[in-house]
């Protein structure tokens, strides 16, 4: 009976790992399509290219816009890094959890601790 429960638990955890892996792939594909990084970089370059032609007021505004664009890119990469770190930790923990059931047997379970 206990072995059946262990097998079922291992299956649930394996499904969770596969689901998390699929979600991470979807996350990457979706964001790569939503955020046009090439256009993003080209916009920053174009704003810089014409900096000599801006008025004083316009140069302040364009500077603020460039700062916001670059800050948003930094925040995106920080958030993405956090997602990858959590996935890495979760994957290791779930793999260790599965090992507990792969090495499970009745003698070990009933042995005094």
From Swiss-Prot:
- In terms of domain of life, where is this protein from? Bacteria
Coiled-coil segments on the chain, per record: none
Q: Which cysteines are cross-linked by disulfides? A: none
Name the GO terms of the biological process aspect: hemolysis in another organism
Protein family per UniProt: Belongs to the hemolysin E family.
Annotated protein name in UniProt: Putative hemolysin E-like protein
């Amino acid at each position: 009976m206990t072995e059946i429960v262990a097998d079922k638990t291992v299956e649930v955890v394996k499904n969770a790992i596969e689901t998390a892996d699929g979600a991470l792939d979807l996350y990457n594909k979706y964001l790569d399509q939503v955020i046009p990084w090439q256009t993003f970089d080209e916009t920053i370059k174009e704003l810089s290219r014409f900096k000599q032609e801006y008025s004083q007021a316009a140069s302040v505004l364009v500077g603020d816009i460039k700062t916001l664009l670059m800050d948003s890119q930094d925040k995106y990469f920080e958030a993405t890094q956090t997602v990858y770190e959590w996935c890495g930790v979760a994957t290791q923990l779930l793999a260790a959890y599965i090992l507990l059931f792969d090495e499970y047997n009745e003698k070990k379970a009933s042995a005094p601790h």
